């Protein structure tokens, strides 16, 4: 965006390893001011995407091999579909269960096909997703669109699966003073990050591939920074 001889670039939510949706690379762009995704901020020890996926799939595979169902609390949009593609690719025989929000999002992929990578569209269109059973626990992976476990129905499901030896894996930010954080701090859940945003290191790497006079690192409400980097 340019006005009065000055230009602004806004990345929006951006991660250059996006799995499901097509994206344009942020390279070779000139702007006086750039607002770049830095939602994960100065997170320490952030592994590469490949390492993150390997760790997550290994944890899921190990739990299933032990007869333990896995529940993945994810946001309503984005991250869950990406994780599902890796399960389909690496653990193709796994039964998948999901709440209505996740199933609805999956159903919308046909309507948004122009934004979805063709290979992902083909992979997910052939995957049968079951509704979460209410009267028994089956072995498989459960997607629930409730990342902080705010819904009482989600918490009841988690309790039911934990009683049966299930494993809860969070893959994104666990916000403080939530039911998710209580479960994590009690040692009844695990955090294995699956990145969908940039860390500060990612943001600076992307900035180095462009020509921005000034950068504002855009963060979430839980890690607010207004620091401006001069480059």
Where are the model-predicted features located?
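Core dinuclear metal-dependent hydrolase active-site scaffold
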Residues: 1-23, 65, 133-135, 139-141, ...
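Hard-cation-handling environments
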Residues: 56-171, 176, 208-211, 218
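Structural motif
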Residues: 6-10, 33, 141, 167, ...
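Short, charged, surface-exposed secondary-structure boundary motifs
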Residues: 19-21, 44-45, 105-111, 178-180
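Conserved phosphate-coordination/catalytic loops
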Residues: 47-54, 78, 148-149, 193-201
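Generic C-terminus detector
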Residues: 204-207, 212-214, 219-231
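Generic long, charged, amphipathic alpha-helical segments
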Residues: 178-202
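His/Asp/Glu-rich metal-coordinating catalytic cores
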Residues: 1-95, 119-120
